[in-house]
């Protein structure tokens, strides 16, 4: 009998088919207070990281944009304003709770007409080849079971010349910063999660999933292998976060 394939869920090894369900449980739990926790955890700096991503996207009027793991809609809101009535934004998320919060939030902010909402898995994108001018995935790739499969799916649905932007936690390049970040992640984050959402475990998983995510150079290589060209990354906040960019040839 062959052994079951496993993958990491934080620091744990779990069967491949189990990871998606366990990640789903995390985000069902935190969806209602996701935005509040983002502000508390980052001191609001996540807004600057996302603004840099928007500015690097090259998105303009008439473009079609796919915001994968779009969650509560921070990027989709800005993209919808940029593409105008002649463009379209699709906010995609595998998690129904996060998608529901994002839909309600964007409707409340007056975004309608040029935005659609799709529940789907980043590994199996339900869109035709060569559909999008730009694809973003912000703080979502580390939760995907097969990252290589997802990157190939993104490459497939981009138009030639289209741009992928991956905004994700990464590896600080300063040893002192790295140690301080570890202390913050493993001691303070779970405490904040317990205090605000009554769920320390989900934020412990967050810290662990960040440590298990590929570093900057490794992710760049994965994007190269998926068929992207001109791949590059920009470190932010000392490498705590990195924005990777790649073009479909």
UniProtKB/Swiss-Prot annotation:
Q: Which PROSITE patterns match?
A: SAM_MT_UBIE (PS51608), UBIE_1 (PS01183), UBIE_2 (PS01184)
SUPFAM superfamilies for this protein? S-adenosyl-L-methionine-dependent methyltransferases
Role: Methyltransferase required for the conversion of demethylmenaquinol (DMKH2) to menaquinol (MKH2) and the conversion of 2-polyprenyl-6-methoxy-1,4-benzoquinol (DDMQH2) to 2-polyprenyl-3-methyl-6-methoxy-1,4-benzoquinol (DMQH2).
Q: Name one GO biological process term.
A: menaquinone biosynthetic process
Keyword Chaperone applies: no
Name used for this protein in its record = Ubiquinone/menaquinone biosynthesis C-methyltransferase UbiE
The organism's taxonomy opens as: Bacteria, Pseudomonadati, Pseudomonadota, Gammaproteobacteria, Cellvibrionales
Q: Give the source species.
A: Cellvibrio japonicus (strain Ueda107)
Its UniProt pathway annotation is:
Quinol/quinone metabolism; menaquinone biosynthesis; menaquinol from 1,4-dihydroxy-2-naphthoate: step 2/2; Cofactor biosynthesis; ubiquinone biosynthesis
Task: Give me the residues that bind S-adenosyl-L-methionine, please.
Answer: 72, 93, 121-122
Q: Which gene encodes it?
A: ubiE
**Which HAMAP family does the record cross-reference, listed alphabetically?**
MenG_UbiE_methyltr
């Amino acid at each position: 009998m062959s052994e079951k394939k496993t993958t990491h869920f934080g620091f744990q090894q779990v069967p491949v088919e189990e990871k998606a369900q366990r990640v789903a449980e995390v985000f069902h739990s935190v969806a209602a207070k996701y935005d509040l926790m983002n502000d508390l955890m980052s001191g609001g700096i996540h807004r600057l990281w996302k603004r840099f991503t928007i500015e690097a996207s090259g998105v303009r009027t008439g473009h079609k944009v796919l915001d994968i793991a779009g969650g509560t809609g921070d990027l989709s809101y800005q993209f919808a304003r940029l593409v105008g009535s002649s463009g379209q934004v699709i906010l995609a998320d595998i998690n129904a709770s996060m998608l529901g919060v994002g839909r309600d939030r964007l409707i409340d902010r007056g975004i309608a007409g040029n935005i659609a909402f799709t529940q789907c898995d980043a590994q199996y994108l339900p869109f035709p080849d060569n559909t999008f001018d730009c694809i973003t995935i912000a703080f979502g790739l580390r939760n995907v079971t097969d990252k290589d499969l997802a990157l190939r799916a993104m490459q497939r649905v981009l138009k030639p010349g289209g741009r992928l932007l991956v905004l994700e936690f990464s590896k600080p390049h300063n040893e002192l910063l790295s140690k301080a970040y570890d202390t913050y992640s493993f001691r303070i984050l779970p405490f904040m999660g317990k205090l605000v959402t009554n769920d320390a475990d989900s934020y412990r998983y967050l810290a662990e999933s960040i440590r298990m995510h590929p570093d900057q150079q490794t992710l760049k290589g994965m994007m190269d292998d998926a068929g992207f060209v001109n791949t590059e990354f920009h470190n932010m906040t000392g490498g705590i976060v990195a924005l990777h960019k790649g073009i479909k040839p």
